[in-house]
């Protein structure tokens, strides 16, 4: 039966169909039993064959994307009310989509449309039943409600369990400690269910307890039959990860005594300073990824062979568009990431050309040492809807937030405002930032100057020397109205290489 399941999963995968959950879970159980016996999750001979499938030539991948795109367009036109009306309004029929180049004919889906009437995006396909809701964090506006079927949830969890077992970060011997509540985000829901399927012990702290309790749990040695003695995987928000790191340092723990092999952080953007701090303190290099609740089947992650993030081209189609003209921009140039989620990977709420408002840069080169010929993200620049212009110069708050995370005297995650002002001598970018505690004037001025020196403005839109002047003001905690809380739908993993 195992061989039948493997063959059926592979066949349905290349036909553009969603594998049966029963087949995936049968493979998960097989991998779990192998791990329980101290073996690798997959025999080496099978690994080679699976790598051969993943390293398929780009033409085969494009053909698969084309089949899935056509099937998705036909499906949403027939069963999703919003897209039937939107496509008719633009005079577009499913038969007009003959190649990937025709995707520009399809309507762009805005976040505001999804927020205003999410039920209009639910498929009316007979037999589909919404059983689970996932909510976006609300970090970029009103939280969105996203609906899933039980089958979809099992499918995503089984997929994560398969990946985790093959990569070695899930298994019956592992202990997973999470500081997200299980219903706080779709990532938590899926990862927790995946861990259960793989036999991993899950310790759910949420935000309860003290930092001392949280650190003690990470380093405490347990004596549970069949389990590793210490927590092997930690998941927390960036601000909580900062706090855990500081608390562990204050407690004087020896980080070499940690059993951590992997750290996952999400729900907020992660700065280069935090990445470096985690590497230096915990000894675990960070592996980056990107994902949204709205397009949960379509994500991107590093393979470990390069700094780029591979997009999951088999479950969705990524475009990068000019924020003003909505026309495609060439690889290597920043633009707004727009995602189409493929049916049947996303069955209840598939989305066409979802405008993420995230500014990214795609790599002009699809080749990678890992062999995957997929779309690759070079960098996530910022939020298109957060851009602040000073004359002809563009500024992105995310770039300022990257620098502010280096200063422990500030509220974490940083809370700040960015405004512009034209004065007689020059144009000014003025940053007001909240302090975590009050400081004397003697302490404030050196800190203010260090922050001003550390802020990096506009990494990709060059600022001419002297063209824009920067002013930093320190404010009491909680005093700023409508600050940027420096949150972003960005996922970063830290993983120890054996």
Named regions from a protein language model:
Residues 76, 136-139, 176, 234, ...:
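Conserved S/T- and glycine-rich ATP-binding loop of Class I adenylate-forming
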Residues 261, 270-366:
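Conserved AMP-binding/adenylate-forming
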Residues 220-223, 252-253, 304-308:
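Short, hinge-like loop/turn segments at secondary-structure boundaries
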Residues 213, 227-275, 285-293:
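Adenylate-forming
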Residues 234, 345-463:
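AMP-binding/adenylate-forming catalytic core of the ANL superfamily
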Residues 176-178, 338, 432:
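Short, well-ordered beta-strand segments
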Residues 150-163, 175-242:
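AMP-binding/adenylate-forming
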Residues 1-135, 141-155, 162, 166, ...:
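Nucleotide 5′-phosphate-binding alpha/beta core
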């Amino acid at each position: 039966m195992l061989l039948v399941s493997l063959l059926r999963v592979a066949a349905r995968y290349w036909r553009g169909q969603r594998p049966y959950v029963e087949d995936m879970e049968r493979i998960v159980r097989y991998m779990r039993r192998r791990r329980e016996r101290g073996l690798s999750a997959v025999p080496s001979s099978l690994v080679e064959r699976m790598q051969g499938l993943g390293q398929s030539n780009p033409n085969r991948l494009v053909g698969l994307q084309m089949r899935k795109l056509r099937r998705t367009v036909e499906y949403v036109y027939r069963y999703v009310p919003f897209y039937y009306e939107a496509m008719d309004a633009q005079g577009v029929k499913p038969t007009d989509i003959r190649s990937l180049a025709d995707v520009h004919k399809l309507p762009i889906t805005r976040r505001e449309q999804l927020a205003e009437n999410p039920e209009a995006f639910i498929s009316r396909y007979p037999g589909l039943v919404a059983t689970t809701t996932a909510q976006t964090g609300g970090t970029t506006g009103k939280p969105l409600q996203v609906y899933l079927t039980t089958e979809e949830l099992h499918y995503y969890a089984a997929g994560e369990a398969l990946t985790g077992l093959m990569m070695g970060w899930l298994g019956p011997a592992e202990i997973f400690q999470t500081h997200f509540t299980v219903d706080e985000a779709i990532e938590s829901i899926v990862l927790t269910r995946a861990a259960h399927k793989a036999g991993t012990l899950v310790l759910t702290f949420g935000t309860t307890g003290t930092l001392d309790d949280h650190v003690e749990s990470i380093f405490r040695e347990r004596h549970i039959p069949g389990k590793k003695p210490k927590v092997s995987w930690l998941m927390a928000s960036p601000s909580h990860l900062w706090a855990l790191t500081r608390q562990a340092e204050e407690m004087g723990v020896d980080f070499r005594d940690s059993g951590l092999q992997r750290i996952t952080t999400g729900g907020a953007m992660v700065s280069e300073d935090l990445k470096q701090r985690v590497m230096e303190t915990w000894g675990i290099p960070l592996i980056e990824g990107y994902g949204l609740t709205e397009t949960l089947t379509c994500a991107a992650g590093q393979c470990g062979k390069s700094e780029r993030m591979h997009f999951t081209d088999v479950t969705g189609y990524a475009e990068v568009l000019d924020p003003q003209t909505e026309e495609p921009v060439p690889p290597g140039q920043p633009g707004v990431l727009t995602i189409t989620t493929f049916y049947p990977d996303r069955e209840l709420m598939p989305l066409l050309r979802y405008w993420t408002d995230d500014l990214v840069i795609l790599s002009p080169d699809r080749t990678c040492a890992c062999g995957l010929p997929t779309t690759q993200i070079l960098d996530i620049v910022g939020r298109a809807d957060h851009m602040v212009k000073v004359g002809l110069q563009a500024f992105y708050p995310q770039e300022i937030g990257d620098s502010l995370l280096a200063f422990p005297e500030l509220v974490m995650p940083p809370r700040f405002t960015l405004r512009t002002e034209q004065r007689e001598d020059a144009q000014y970018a003025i940053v007001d930032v909240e302090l975590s505690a009050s400081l004397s004037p003697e302490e404030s001025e050196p800190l203010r100057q260090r922050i001003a020196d550390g802020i990096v403005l506009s990494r990709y839109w060059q600022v001419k020397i002297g063209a824009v002047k920067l002013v930093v003001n320190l404010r009491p905690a909680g005093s700023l109205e409508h600050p940027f809380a420096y949150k972003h739908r960005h996922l970063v993993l830290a993983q120890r290489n054996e």
